[in-house]
């Protein structure tokens, strides 16, 4: 039982005049932001009353959002995919049926269910149905290998697995002793129940809410080893949505093409934000740059959510192909998931207009900062500034804040920090702020620049080098499509830089030309000693370069921790 004196202390603290004033200010700001999105559409008074009742019953969960939208926007499209469209009413009834059937099979509150699906209606329906049951949903990365899947499913004690039929071979080892269901059917030979069958036969009546909402578990990218499960509770209020809306001008009831994988923290964040705004999701199972432009022309979305490598693939299309499609409906292209090179941001906006918004964060920290088109024009490569209610500070290795302009480890505080790893442990935490695992600096205008991973810093001849600076410079070369830089062992200097470069089509760029180019723009110790040309860089499903696949077998780490830095304060808080 909780200490009654602690309860009294918290109650007294909440009644402090400054706390009350801050809470009132936040509520006023929330209303203003939501009104700005067009959130308040004309609705009959009786429907408003019932919507409030549903919100109280289901809280800010996918189950609650679709229950409310089935009432207030019943005939609006909720999802558009390769099978057609589903209205909010249809999706609500279908997920009722699915939830009833899963419940009949023994799936219930606080049970863990693994979902391995691409972007399509069954991902959404599985998510909503499990939310209606109060189950915890574990999203599996579709790029994982079989052993990784089996290890994660066992570690997370999943009682059931829902997956697309194309992953049958990958999940084989994870299926033993667990209920299994097929989501998207690539053929009609499934020997186990399919979500389509459960939806067709299930009871479509409404369910009672669970005693507590289920959690969402997003897996880390696993670029440095076995992915960890990052658990996150459902938001208690609309503050997280308002934080993002304070920097990204999304509107209610608009179409959003979510190209970023929904199982990834960025794709799922956009999905969650769309729940608040009653968005229509346009989903494609596979990303293809030209097919994506064709989908924009066909479905006329006003928003597109992508990862940087998707923008890169679009910009690598021949100019005549890019301009073949009418993309004028787009007014927001939101990008996240990995570093956005400044040159890519500039070239994309030159082609498609100043509609690009770059969100920087991590699976554990959710978001830290957002760069608007104005930020990206003024300072290409910036990660932007913290949105409302978010704090970003930089600390050295002695946990002291660095002086203004200095480089330090990035820590963030916001409304949606994760609850911790499901296997135990947490990220580094200072004064309630969570490490993103990156290092960076803040310029005189308060803009954050991410210089690289904390554990990727290369120490060569006593000099500290962050690969991102060299990679960004290489990417700006006319003959370079993409590049990655790592540190490899060197007897004389401790480490030396090695660049892995993908040439642009038709380029005959040599390693010496690249070295000369870097030398003319950066300090000598930042010039790669070796350059290896490749057809493509190894990437995971969200576009991050998997650098451990580039490192020599005997050198699976590529850096030391940053040296100690000054303790002078350099922080930023945006309200």
Label the model's feature ranges:
Residues 1-34, 104-105, 128, 132-201, ...:
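Structural core segment of the AMP-binding/adenylate-forming
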Residues 238-255, 263-303, 317:
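Conserved AMP-binding/adenylation subdomain of ANL enzymes
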Residues 92-97, 230-251, 312:
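Conserved structural elements of the adenylate-forming
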Residues 385-389, 398-431, 463-465:
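Conserved ATP/PPi-binding loop(s) of AMP-dependent carboxylate-activating enzymes
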Residues 87-89, 215-239:
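Conserved AMP-binding A3 loop
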